[in-house]
A protein has these predicted regions:
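Conserved ABC transporter NBD signature motif
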Residues: 62-78
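Conserved ABC ATPase "signature" region
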Residues: 100, 104, 112-130
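ABC ATPase "signature
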Residues: 217-218
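Helix-to-loop junction immediately C-terminal to a conserved catalytic motif
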Residues: 55
């Protein structure tokens, strides 16, 4: 029996039952504890479909998805925090109000408990300088960091990040990467990215997707060896036919 926090077996997803095409087809995916698992693929490869299924946004057309032992959508959602490519935040609130609200809504009882959780999220995401600012006044980089802090306040075992570095400048991206590495000491992190170097530097394991299917998976070295290439970029090009 698989003991990984995230187990996806024989996953198929079709949005339109009248069409033959699947958004994802026969996908098997596993993400372990205290690790970073990356999804690589071009637009339309099926990455977002798989991530949203893992986060409990939709059922599989066929196959099974288990997150921390839960296979029903409510159970999955309780165990996953989803960080979208474009932050979805209440911009009328201050950062402080937003994070305390998220911590309280996530079942953290008592003001001391909420404070400890929020303090940790603020420290990891380096938000002290904007803690009292309104979300509406923040830059894209800070919005992404607040979105990540919000996911930390949910206290879930699994954090799913869809194209987290999109639109960030190199300095902001480097900071977010450090935060992800810190989180992975106690969490299961799953992320999608277009950037080969990002996956190579961050991920314990990578899955390369093309046309809704997994072309290859393993450590970076394993994927490179399997493809017969010299590096991950060459392996990606060969495996996806680009």
């Amino acid at each position: 029996m698989w003991t990984d926090p995230v187990v996806v077996e024989n996953f198929y997803k079709k949005y339109d039952p009248k069409k033959k095409e699947y958004a994802c087809e026969n996908v098997n995916f596993f993400a372990g504890s205290n690790s970073i698992t990356g999804l690589l693929g071009q637009n339309g490869a099926g990455k977002s479909t798989l991530l949203k299924a893992i986060a409990g946004f939709h059922y599989a057309t066929e196959g099974t998805i288990s997150v921390c032992g839960c296979t029903d959508l409510p159970g999955i959602r309780k165990n996953v925090a989803f960080v979208p490519e474009i932050p979805v935040l209440d911009r009328s609130l201050t950062v402080k109000e937003l994070l305390y609200l998220e911590a309280s809504l996530s079942g953290n009882e008592g003001s001391q408990s909420c404070r400890g959780i929020v303090d940790r999220a603020v420290e990891i995401c380096a938000l002290n300088e904007v803690f009292l600012e309104r979300v509406s006044k923040l830059s894209r980089g800070f919005l992404q960091r607040v979105s990540l802090a919000k996911s930390i306040c949910r206290k879930t075992q699994v954090i799913v990040m869809d194209e987290f570095s999109s639109g960030l400048d190199p300095v902001q991206n480097a900071l977010i990467r450090r935060q992800i590495v810190e989180l992975a000491k106690t969490k299961t992190i799953i992320l999608s990215t277009h950037h080969i170097e990002e996956a190579q530097n961050l991920c314990n394991k990578v899955y390369i997707m093309t046309k809704g299917m997994v072309a290859c998976n393993g450590t970076v070295d394993e994927v490179v060896s399997f493809s017969g290439c010299r590096n991950l970029e060459e392996a990606f090009i060969r495996l996806t036919g680009n």
